[in-house]
Curated annotation (Swiss-Prot):
Subcellular location, principal: mitochondrion
UniProt-recorded name of the protein: Putative uncharacterized protein Q0297, mitochondrial
Chain intervals for the UniProt region annotation (Disordered): 1-42
Native source organism of the sequence: Saccharomyces cerevisiae (strain ATCC 204508 / S288c)
Superkingdom classification of source: Eukaryota
Length: 51
């Protein structure tokens, strides 16, 4: 699970900070789902946040 998460994060970001993970998960504007474990390992979240 952790390997998958790191793989997705490294795909979009070279070295994302640890605190950026919970921030994105708690951000409701990402997908309107709120604190969801699926958002954390979702590459779309980081892509949308970067653009």
């Amino acid at each position: 699970m952790k390997m998958k998460t790191n793989k997705y994060m490294n795909m979009v970001r070279p070295a994302p900070p640890r605190r950026a993970d919970p921030e994105g998960v708690r951000d409701p504007s990402t997908m309107g789902g709120g604190p969801n474990p699926f958002l954390r390992r979702s590459p779309y979240m980081y892509i949308n946040k970067k653009k």
